[in-house]
């Protein structure tokens, strides 16, 4: 017997990753979890321009990107009063993820997860539930 993914009330989700494969993988995983209001950006500067118009409930952000890394992007998102939840993603070690989580939290952002890539679908589903709870809190 297979279990179908439990649909979650769709959130507005902004994906930010410079890797097209990772963006596609995450978008597919989110769609499988019932998340249909997803926008993807491969450039942090473009994502900053998207924030005020799209107003995502959740931002899923890679840390290691060219031009502007995830930490700088998150600092600027915090300065622009981004009020949604954040999931940090990285291929780097756990210490880097923890440091990034601490820095982003210090900027006033709500970090609900810091995950090593690729994030397992079950973990992503749990984090989406947390983001939905934050949205209604």
Over which residues does each language-model region extend?
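Non-catalytic signal-transmission and effector/linker regions of two-component phosphorelay proteins
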Residues: 1-14, 27, 110, 120-137
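Receiver (REC) domain active-site loop signature in two-component systems and cognate sites
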Residues: 65
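Active-site residues of response regulator receiver
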Residues: 17, 62
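Alpha4 helix (beta4-alpha4-beta5 surface) of REC/receiver domains from two-component response regulators
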Residues: 72-76, 92-114
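Active-site beta3 strand of CheY-like receiver
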Residues: 54-60, 86-87
């Amino acid at each position: 017997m297979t279990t179908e993914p439990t649909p979650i009330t769709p959130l507005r989700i902004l994906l930010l990753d410079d890797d097209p494969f990772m963006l596609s993988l995450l978008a597919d995983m989110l769609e499988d979890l019932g998340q249909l209001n997803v926008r993807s950006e491969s450039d942090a500067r473009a994502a900053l321009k998207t924030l005020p118009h799209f107003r995502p409930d959740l931002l899923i952000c890679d840390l290691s990107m060219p031009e502007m890394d995830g930490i700088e992007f998150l600092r600027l998102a915090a300065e622009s009063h981004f009020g949604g939840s954040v999931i940090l993603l990285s291929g780097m070690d756990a210490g880097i993820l923890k440091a990034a989580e601490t820095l982003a939290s210090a900027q006033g952002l709500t970090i609900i997860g810091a995950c090593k890539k690729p994030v397992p679908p079950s973990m992503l589903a749990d984090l989406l539930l947390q983001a939905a709870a934050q949205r209604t809190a």
